[in-house]
Amino acid sequence: MHQHPRSPAPAAPPSASRPGANRSDDRPNSPAFDPRVQLTRGLGIETEARSSGQTSSSRPAKEAISKLNQLVTNYHTKAALVILASRIDLTRSDDTPKINPKVNRWFAIDLEDIDALREQLRFWRINDVSEQPPPPLIIETYLDTKDLTNNQSLVALDEQGKRFDVLESLSRSSEAHAKGPVSSRSEDVILERWRVELGNTPNKALPADLGSILPKIYKQSIVTFRTLFTYSKLLPAWKLAKRNGRLHAHPALQIRYRILAGKPNPDDSRPDRLTTPLFDSSNKVVETYTFGTTESPVGYLSIQVTYRTSCEFRVDDSEALLSSRFMGADDEVFRPSLPSRESNLKAANSGVGSAPVEKRTVEDPDPSRAYGSLSTFHHVGPTTSASPISALRAARESGAASPSPPSSSSRKPVEVVKASPLGRAAVLANESSPGVARRSSISFPPFKAPPLSASPSLVDPPLGMSPRSGTMTRPQFPESKNMPPPSMAASARKSLPLPGASETTATSSNSASPRPTPIARYSSAFTHRRGRPSSGNINRIDDENSSGKTSATSSNPQPGSGLLAEATGTSADSIHADDENITEFLKMLDLRKDLLRTSNSASADVTARRTTATSAALTRFQRMRDSNAQLSESMSSSMLLQRSSTSSSKQLSGVPPMVAGTSISTASSPGKPISPHTPHTPAIPSRLSSNSIVDYGNERGREQPSSVGDYTPEGPTIPHRPSVVTVNAIDIPTSPGLPFPPYRRPSSAAPPPPPVATDDDEIFPFNLRSVSLGAEERSHNSLSALQRQHDLEGAKSNTQPTRREQRPPLASEDPSRRSSSTGHGTSPHKRTSLSGPTVAPSPSNNHVYQPRFSLCRGRGLSGGPHSLSSGSSSLARGAPSDLAERDHDRDVNASGSNSGTSTVEDRRAAGRRPSSGRNIPPPSQVEEDEPLLFAMSDFGASRRSFEEGRHGNHGRRL
């Protein structure tokens, strides 16, 4: 037992002369000091009273008496350590913290022994119980209000959460009982008072076998201290201490303690700070608990605690406390005479023989019914008027009479349906007072076509509906309708069979006035074929169609539009009728027979889902049709504009860029006119056409050496015809959006067209060519060969001016040669040199390009009337007028072209622009082109070297 031997005590005096023989006479006869009155409380550890005649002639040993003193001393000190360690951090009060603190292991509880507490308990540690027992150990825990500032107040909270000023309550109690000035201790709020006491047994001497009794006393004390250790952490003061430790509360809320010796002075007139009530309450202010008594040879050892039952304290602002006091006074003075809202809810929920149903009034709606639709007011509550338009409609129908504010007895209960996987359902019960009737409202949603997901079923009963939630039968009054969220698709709703005609036109038999026909109870899986209900107005369907309640894709009402939550009036004699409640329950069971048929509901669900999916797909593709058409037009326009900007940038700076010829695509094959019936209309040049051009380049290389010899001075007749003309390129037509009249595309099985139809002017009604041709469209002759050809052909050009202008086209002329002339536009300078409007513009293309354009058309075509031919512009820039005339004569002789007009060309020229070398332009056309002409002096001789360099570069790349 960790007891150290002590020297034997001196012989005890006779019992008659012991100073403790008359201890019972010195103590007052009070229940607090007499442990015998506590026999029914605590642990009940005590023994029977020994007979008064039992005496011991022998004295106990000195060592046994020392062990008894040690047991009593540790009983007091360990009780104080257990009590204070659970409420106060004693380690902070220790001035000299130790690395290896001393542990107190008495009574099988290990706690750190604090030196500061040892000093405060020194009087109980040095006392000798054999001579004089120690006084009672009093430990008080309290709150000190000295740390509060002037604008802070310590408040106590009652069971309802009301605040009361603690100092004010203590001051009133002190002034009522005090005869003198109030001491400073009135600022303390005592929370607990612990009492550890050694009670004296009268006429009791120490037994001779004291050493054998002490172990039994120690074991009994272990049980007491275990109980103390546990119960001390269940009292309200311990909870306050833990809450302050977590929240780092105000210093005024920190629990303090003080240790007193003896009992309070009974003559003190001041009231006890522990038992003073801080606020009015029906509960006890304090309670007392005794941990039992342990009998010892020197008396009864006992531990008792008196504690406050309410320790809810906090520090608040004084002004806020004063304001709350005024508000509390207003609540008491201006208390309404009508019953409260909570009492009405309890009365409405109370029912006999049914499950509890949660109901809410119109003034107290369910927050879960808040719906963020544009057609609602974004409010929480029953949608009596779902939109401003419906509110005006309802006001117009109800008349000019203003309704009176509803009283507490006429509130309309609102059924709140619990949330479910299918969504929240807002249910309006048609229960009202006898004098109040609710009119149906018609809503006009702002959108004509609601989304597909906003197509709920109208007749599914609420998921949490009680059998007695409604008063009317379902065929007569659709009392509740689902209000699913907008994300709920129509396919998630189950459909029911269509009702009979008698059910849809049913009226109430116990109502004096006819009621409007309710909304259809059943919903078909084909929601777009469901008929619109009537609400007593023959123009209801027309109004709904004009207001946007129906659409091409879905005729279901939009959530929040008010149609799902329309309420109809009820009569006074149908409220809270038990027989009608039973009837309603039976009707509901009859209507929901499909719950037992899972296959039918599953098939209906699949059908509804399939119908909705089909409708959604059709709607999506219908909307995509217009957008795709617009996208196609936009892409075509952008490609045409891009090619126009690209080709116009390659032209000369003096030519206007917005020429119709600059947007021609070169994807079409030669000899095939562009027709609006072309099956393929790519806006991007095709690589197939480019490949065909490259393939024909091989033939072009074989034909090139004979190009010089073809032009002889004897005449324009060409002796031989290239064999590659019979091969046609792959036809990849261009975009149909070109600014020329449509041409019919010839069939591939038809015979070859006449030479006139294969002319390039038929395909491209433009007579000019861009300056910047690609590398594959240029010839590869050297500059000396070009000059030699120019000299040979210029010698014969002066002798044929008249015959050049009037010679008709030869029937045997090579169409490829004629097409080559159209590949190059006439020079504006030559056009100005001709006198008279009847003179046709002569082709000015160089013969160098003839083999190339006899095969296929190049990518550099820009048939605008203001484009210049690269061949003519590169040789005739800056030349005098006689040289230009010689070039003009030479080109006519070489290409075999003349200014005559054939019969076929006359017919075709009526609907298109004039072609170079074929048709005589009208005077208006010549006059139109006059402001756009430019002088040849704008182009210097340096341009010729630039073209020569480009010829060389392109030749090397090929």
Curated annotation (Swiss-Prot):
Keywords: Autophagy, Cytoplasm, Protein transport, Transport. Residues 736-756 have a biased composition (Pro residues). Residues 1-62, 337-417, 430-576, 644-762, 790-958 are annotated as: Disordered. Residues 397-411, 501-514, 644-653, 864-881 have a biased composition (Low complexity). One of its GO terms (biological process) is protein localization to phagophore assembly site. The keyword Protein transport applies. InterPro entries: ATG13 (IPR040182), Atg13_N (IPR018731), HORMA_dom_sf (IPR036570). Residues 357-367, 883-892 have a biased composition (Basic and acidic residues). Coiled coil: none annotated. Gene3D superfamilies: 6.10.140.1900, HORMA domain (3.30.900.10). It is found in: Cytoplasm; Preautophagosomal structure. Residues 50-59, 547-559, 833-848, 894-903 have a biased composition (Polar residues). One of its GO terms (cellular component) is Atg1/ULK1 kinase complex. Pfam families: ATG13. Its main location: cytoplasm. It comes from the Eukaryota. Interacts with atg1 to form the atg1-atg13 kinase complex. Activates the atg1 kinase in a nutritional condition dependent manner through the TOR pathway, leading to autophagy. Also involved in cytoplasm to vacuole transport (Cvt) and more specifically in Cvt vesicle formation. Seems to play a role in the switching machinery regulating the conversion between the Cvt pathway and autophagy. Finally, atg13 is also required for glycogen storage during stationary phase. Belongs to the ATG13 family. Fungi subfamily. This is Autophagy-related protein 13. It comes from Aspergillus niger (strain ATCC MYA-4892 / CBS 513.88 / FGSC A1513). The gene is atg13.
